[in-house]
Amino acid sequence: MIKGIAEYLDININTDLYLTMYNMVKKHDNNTFGKTPFVSYSLEDNRTGKPTGYEKAFWPVLNEHKRVHPHYQFRSTGFNTANSTEKDVFAHTDIDLDTEHPNGYNIVVPVLGNSRIDYFETRDEEVYLPEKNAHGHAYYHEFYAQKEMGQGTPEFEKFLSDRKIGHIIVDKPILIQTTIMHRVVVTEAPRCAWVTRWNNIPKDVSFQEFKQKVENIL
């Protein structure tokens, strides 16, 4: 756990409900999770920017999460899955440049398997915006070093190790801040987790204030 960045939530979770929703959608078309080897079942197709039609299936959870905050990012909200511990989500940020307010926080609910989220010191001069989404907006940062050294190389892993500031084990629901570079490491597969990315949150709403709201409502 990293205070103010990635913390456990004291909330009740109906795992059977999440499994039921996952089994409903995994029979249908999946979505690539950006450039990563993860497979996702989210509210928006990452490649086209069009709705996937899963909102009805996900409504039991979305309806509760909208009580916390009415805005969520369609592209990132849904299930993220990996069938191997060799697959991870590379170090990145998640940002929203197309909303009125800048803040965004993710709830991550483990459903199957296990994973760890590593966090890294984030220096402006070491990151860049590599691409735009289907709507024409930059949506994440990447390390220059990843492009220069290559993802997964010993040199880049050493770079990450030198900048690691902490981690959190995703074995129960967590709330995370995503403007700091972080990556997801699968430690037990198959891995499936639910993510709701609440966005368009006013900048004066702190991590702790939002966490308290999540725990009060959920």
Please name every model-derived segment.
Residues 4-8, 104-106, 163, 193:
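Intrinsic-disorder/low-complexity, polar/charged segments enriched in Ser/Thr/Lys/Arg/Asp/Glu/Gln
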Residues 67-71, 112-116, 201:
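Secondary-structure boundary elements
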Residues 5, 18-21, 58, 62, ...:
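Extended hydrophobic/Leu-rich segments
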Residues 73-78, 106-110, 118-121, 175-177, ...:
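A structural signal for short, well-ordered beta-strand segments and their strand-loop junctions
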Residues 1-80, 88:
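Non-heme Fe(II)/2-oxoglutarate
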Residues 80-169:
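Catalytic core of non-heme Fe(II) oxygenases with the double-stranded beta-helix
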Residues 10-13, 111, 196-200:
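Short beta-strand-to-loop capping motifs
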Residues 142-218:
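Catalytic core of Fe(II)/2-oxoglutarate
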